């Protein structure tokens, strides 16, 4: 049995907490281990984000005792599973009793929890690379327990299950999506038997709560190269159940000159580009859905080939349904709708003469999401022709420079008519109604077209000038 204490830096918070937990175990007469992702990430030299302890006693009682030593006043207990979370500011901690679980067919909720030994607990874990335990007893501190070959799989960059994969994924179907996540996050390959089992059981993901599924999808989008996980979802048949609108893109051709031949793989490239350009999960999500309506709007033109007229506007509407079944927050839904609707606008400016009026309209429409919109448009450049990429980027930089200039000069980001509705009503003796909206719209259009300045005096003068034309229309 090897000892990995040399991997545990002595001056870290994690090391101090582990040694404290080990001593507490001695005081209480119970073995304590650090398990799972923490051990895996020690070997991979990845950031250590949380500590999972396995204890050979009641998990809630041990968590209460450890929290007291850490001066944490309250824990979050789950007595049914003998598990508790300790909200320690320095690093999140979870404590669980060694256990195994049995499941009712068709459900991922355990019907029976049985306390077990170290090997029995590790056997129930999702992948062998997470079925690792380090002994924290002061006399054995750092001793590695690897009963199912996890270290060998870490070195091979391979995801395998401790149990037969059919049993592992049948018990908890969410593990199938987690396989895609770990493959993307760790740049690992899924074992052939596991891949086959996922493909055969893909439909069982339907029994998992939508909130859990969406959370795992978002975790995939948060990786350095999300396409790895997303392509696995498609290849295993999971995408059909997780996000059918994205699955519909697979195999649909589009114009070869500009993009990948396949809409799905073009989208994967856009998501990866967005991941390189930004850490924002919502922007990566926008990259995933920006062409969501292309399958619905795909037509064949005898001269142009495939066309997707209106896929931006149709996509905005489709996202209402998508956000509902994915149970996305309203704020994220509205963000995705806006960027999907507008994602062609900056590109259209690049392809035509760059006028101040066109720039103003994009700035006003995008509002606070302007920077994200421009980043999405950069990510959307996936042509394989390097000369076209160079030309596109040069034109794009011209647009961005002019946009910055116009925005600074005209203060348009939170644009609306400098003359407000109440003043219009008071000036002309009107009540609330469509006439007020018409006057405000006319003022805003004049500003966007460069006919008047974006300031109060010019707007009021223009209002008085056009009132008769608007009110007698």
Question: Which residues does each predicted region cover?
Answer:
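Catalytic cores of the polymerase beta-like nucleotidyltransferase superfamily
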Residues: 1-473
């Amino acid at each position: 049995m090897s000892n990995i204490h040399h991997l545990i830096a002595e001056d870290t918070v994690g090391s101090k907490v582990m040694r404290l937990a080990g001593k507490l175990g001695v005081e209480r007469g119970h073995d304590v281990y650090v398990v799972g992702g923490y051990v895996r990430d020690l070997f991979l030299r990845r950031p250590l984000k949380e500590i999972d302890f396995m204890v050979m006693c009641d998990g809630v009682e041990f968590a209460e005792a450890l929290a007291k030593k850490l001066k944490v006043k309250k824990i979050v207990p789950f007595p049914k599973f003998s598990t508790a979370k300790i909200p320690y500011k320095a690093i999140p901690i979870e404590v669980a009793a060694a256990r195994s679980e049995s499941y009712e067919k068709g459900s991922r909720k355990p019907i029976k929890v049985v306390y077990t030994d170290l090997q029995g607990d590790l056997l129930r874990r999702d992948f062998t690379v997470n079925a690792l335990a380090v002994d924290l007893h002061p006399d054995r501190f750092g001793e590695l327990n690897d009963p199912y070959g996890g270290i060998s799989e870490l070195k091979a960059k391979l995801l395998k299950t401790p149990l037969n994969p059919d049993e592992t994924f049948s018990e908890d179907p969410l593990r199938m999506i987690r396989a895609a996540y770990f493959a993307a996050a760790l740049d690992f390959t899924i074992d052939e038997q596991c891949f086959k089992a996922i493909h055969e059981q893909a439909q069982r993901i339907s029994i998992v709560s939508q909130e859990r599924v969406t959370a795992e999808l978002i975790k995939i989008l948060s990786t350095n190269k999300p396409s790895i996980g997303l392509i696995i979802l498609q290849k295993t048949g999971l995408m059909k159940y997780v996000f059918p609108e994205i699955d519909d893109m697979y195999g649909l051709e589009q114009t070869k000159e500009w993009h990948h031949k396949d809409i799905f793989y073009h989208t994967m490239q856009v998501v990866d580009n967005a991941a390189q350009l930004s850490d924002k999960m919502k922007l990566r999500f926008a990259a995933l859905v920006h062409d969501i309506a292309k399958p619905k709007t795909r037509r064949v033109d005898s001269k142009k080939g495939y066309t997707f007229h209106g896929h931006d506007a149709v996509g905005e509407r489709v996202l209402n349904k998508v956000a509902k079944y994915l149970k996305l927050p309203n704020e994220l839904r509205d963000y995705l709708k806006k960027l999907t609707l507008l994602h062609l606008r900056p590109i259209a400016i690049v392809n035509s003469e760059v006028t101040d009026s066109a720039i103003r309209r994009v700035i006003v429409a995008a509002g606070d999401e302007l920077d994200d919109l421009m980043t999405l448009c950069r990510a959307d450049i996936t042509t394989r022709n390097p000369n076209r990429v160079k030309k596109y980027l040069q034109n794009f930089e011209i647009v961005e420079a002019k946009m910055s200039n116009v925005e600074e000069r005209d203060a348009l980001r939170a644009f609306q008519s400098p003359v407000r509705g109440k003043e219009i009503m008071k000036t002309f003796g009107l009540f609330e109604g469509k006439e007020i909206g018409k006057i405000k719209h006319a003022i805003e259009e004049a500003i966007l077209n460069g006919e008047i300045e974006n300031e109060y005096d010019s707007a009021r003068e223009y209002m008085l000038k056009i009132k008769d034309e608007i009110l007698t229309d």
